[in-house]
Amino acid sequence: MHSRGFWKRYCIKTTLTERIRELSDGEVRIEGRRVNELSSRERNVAMSFENYGLYPDFTIYDNIAYPLKIHKESPEKIKEKVMDIAKKLRLTNVLYVKPAALSSGQKQRVSIARALVRNPDVTIMDEPLSHLDARMRSNMRSVIRHLHEKLGLTTVYVTHDQIEAMTMADKILIMNNGERQQVGTPDEVYYYPANVFVAGFIGTPQMNLVPCTIRRAGKETTIVEKGAFEVKTERYADSLDDGKAVIYGFRPHDLEVSREAKDGFFKGTVYVTEPLGETTIVSIKAGDIILKAELEGNVYDLVQDQEIYFGIDDKKAHLFDAATEMRIIPGDE
């Protein structure tokens, strides 16, 4: 069973979920069963959407219970299931009011409850947490993931929020402008991004992506950003031609900062610091570019325009072809 995240905005992700719900061409199989000719209800697919889709004249109890009544479950079983999901989603105190009396966040939770209450074969969730505040969103991520694992649900989860995708998904489908960019586990898309788009989209702070040139001298290969750094690499053997245009990607936490000059480090100046409590984001000006480093703790001794030195961990860095923007696979992978 997999939970999948489709994103980002305007990439026909909702159109894809509609095809799962009601395909007009091709083939869809759910639990090994061809469902093309079946209606949405017969496919046993439940849905929760950003715009709620609640019945305004029904109480919250009846909204949640509706799919169970359609499937002709007994009143006793309906009550048991509704009360159970309402408790999990913190809705027990609003079960006997109508949707107009609820906040947008509560309506969102009712929509989720109605989707999950009947234990469908597939659940489609289209940005179900978009109207919740940060605290409730974090709690609901845990609740949905818990129910997903407990009930063995297959969930197609649409989101533009990478945190939701990374924390909740077993596999992620990343899309841009209607085209698939990468399919993989959270670890795969984070540690082995297929292209520049995925590399820049996954991870906070964003990966440093720097246009560079390859310089070859005998068997020695150097990644050069003129005026900023020259990093020697042995990971790509003879696969890189002299003068090749590449994009060098490395995450902020793989950038080491020193107050003093060190072998293999490059000179820069502090552009700005952003203290976040457990970490501090330091923007470093090197030549004509700005790099971001993520350092542990609050770093109070770095001030704007201060001269510092930085080192790049090449073993954790990535190279992308500047023309295709696809990742170049190193020889040690």
State where each predicted segment sits.
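Helix-to-loop junction immediately C-terminal to a conserved catalytic motif
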Residues: 17-18
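ABC ATPase nucleotide-binding domain helices that frame the ATP-binding cleft
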Residues: 12-14, 110
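C-terminal boundary and immediately downstream tail of ABC-type ATPase nucleotide-binding domains
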Residues: 192-214, 249, 313
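Conserved ABC transporter NBD signature motif
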Residues: 26-34
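Conserved coupling/switch loops of ABC nucleotide-binding domains, chiefly the family-specific signature
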Residues: 23-27, 177
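Non-catalytic connector elements of ABC transporters
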Residues: 207, 217-333
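Walker A (P-loop) phosphate-binding loop of ABC-type ATPase nucleotide-binding domains
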Residues: 2-11
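ABC ATPase nucleotide-binding domains
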Residues: 43-46, 50, 54-197
